């Protein structure tokens, strides 16, 4: 298994601590006036999502986590698990609710997304940055309601609620940024 020295730490690096995979969020190199230099690191546990702050002496090394980001196709949900498939090998993986988390409201069947695997177990699911979804329910926008451009809430086919401009109607397809949850454009 590969090891990373503290000099190789950077955001996004996946490391193994106490038997759990962690992703480095922030890394700060500190050289005090007196004493040994150290790295102050903020890490997120990929299994639980908890964020911790750890310090490593300069020159320490940590084990690399065997974490892979894989492009997979979302197939279906059986109520308890969300099932994904690798398109090339047709290998299927079932992810629990903790792994899918907020991605639930952006996923529709046959969509491609990135699944983070650790020892063959899905840890996290990342939807594509932009998704195109149909509006299933929204109030009609009445002309003259506002002086400037206003917005109204709209429910999408996946159940997510997004604020859309008044001119967007029920049944239309809209593009949504999944990172912010905001309306981008009509399709």
From Swiss-Prot:
InterPro entries per the UniProt record, alphabetical: Elong-fact-P_C, NA-bd_OB-fold, Rib_uL2_dom2, Transl_elong_fac_P/YeiP, Transl_elong_KOW-like, Transl_elong_P/YeiP_cen, Transl_elong_P/YeiP_CS, Transl_elongation_fac_P
PROSITE patterns hit by this protein: EFP
Molecular function via GO: translation elongation factor activity
Major place of residence: cytoplasm
Pfam families documented for this protein: EFP, EFP_N, Elong-fact-P_C
Pathway stated in the Swiss-Prot or TrEMBL entry: Protein biosynthesis; polypeptide chain elongation
Compartments (UniProt record): Cytoplasm
Family annotation (SUPFAM superfamilies): Nucleic acid-binding proteins (SSF50249), Translation proteins SH3-like domain (SSF50104)
Membership in a protein family: Belongs to the elongation factor P family.
Protein name, as recorded: Elongation factor P
Gene name linked to the record: efp
């Amino acid at each position: 298994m590969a090891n990373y020295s503290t000099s190789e730490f950077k955001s996004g690096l996946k490391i193994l601590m106490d038997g759990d995979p962690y992703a480095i969020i922030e890394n700060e190199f500190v050289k005090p006036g007196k004493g040994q230099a150290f790295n102050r690191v903020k890490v997120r546990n990929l299994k639980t999502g908890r964020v911790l702050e750890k310090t490593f002496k300069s020159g320490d090394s940590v084990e690399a986590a065997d974490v892979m980001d894989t492009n997979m196709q979302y197939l279906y949900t059986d109520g308890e698990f969300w099932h994904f498939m690798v398109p090339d090998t047709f290998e299927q993986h079932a992810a629990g609710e903790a792994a899918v988390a907020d991605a639930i409201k952006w996923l529709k069947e046959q969509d491609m997304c990135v699944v983070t695997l650790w020892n063959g177990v899905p840890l996290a699911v990342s939807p594509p940055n932009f998704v195109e979804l149909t509006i299933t329910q929204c109030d009609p926008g009445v002309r003259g309601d506002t002086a400037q451009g206003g917005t109204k809430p709209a429910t999408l086919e996946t159940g997510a609620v997004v604020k859309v401009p008044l001119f967007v109607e029920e049944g239309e397809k809209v593009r949504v940024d999944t990172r912010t949850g905001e309306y981008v454009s009509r399709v």
